[in-house]
Amino acid sequence: YIMELELSIIDYTSPFYEAVLSLRNDILRRPLGLNLYEEDLHEDRDQYIVIAVMEHQLQACLMLKILDHITVKIRQMAVATSMQHKGVGLMIMTYAETFCALNNYTIVELHARKTAVGFYKKLGYQTDGIEFEEVGIPHVKMTKNLS
């Protein structure tokens, strides 16, 4: 039933934006004892938002931040708990990469939580191996060349 997922690109003016904030908070912040709504969300306005919707409900999202004319950073990928381990992350990442490639961006980078490094490696991302802390947990920078 994953095939019923509709993927699209929105921005912060979309009616889905509130659901995007809620999902990011529930999946990425609340388990760490943090609150997304206390963060500065201004830069969301300059980013593309990739969403996966099924039956009018947001199931997954990620943020695309343009760094320069060839580089995009993927941020805050979140998949609803009920949809995890069903290929949704793969679908939304593939959709995001296709969008980047079609718009002539050739490098995608991201800061992966250590627990997610294996997932991104399967998608062809490589790490420099240097660990750092973000939101209080270990991350590594990963990159993929789309060209």
Give names to the regions the model predicted.
Residues 25-59:
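Active-site rim helix/loop that mediates acceptor-substrate recognition in acyltransferases
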Residues 66-77, 84, 134-138:
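A conserved beta-turn-beta hairpin within the catalytic core of GNAT-like acetyltransferases
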Residues 79, 85-98:
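Conserved acetyl-CoA-binding loop-helix of GNAT-fold acetyltransferases
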Residues 80, 113:
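Residue-level recognition of the GNAT/N-acetyltransferase active site
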Residues 93, 100-112:
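Conserved GNAT acetyl-CoA-binding A-motif
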Residues 51, 57-66, 73-78:
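Conserved beta-strand in the GNAT
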Residues 109-111, 121, 126-141:
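Conserved catalytic-core motifs of GNAT/GCN5-like acyltransferases
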Residues 4-20:
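A short beta-loop-alpha structural element at the N-terminal edge
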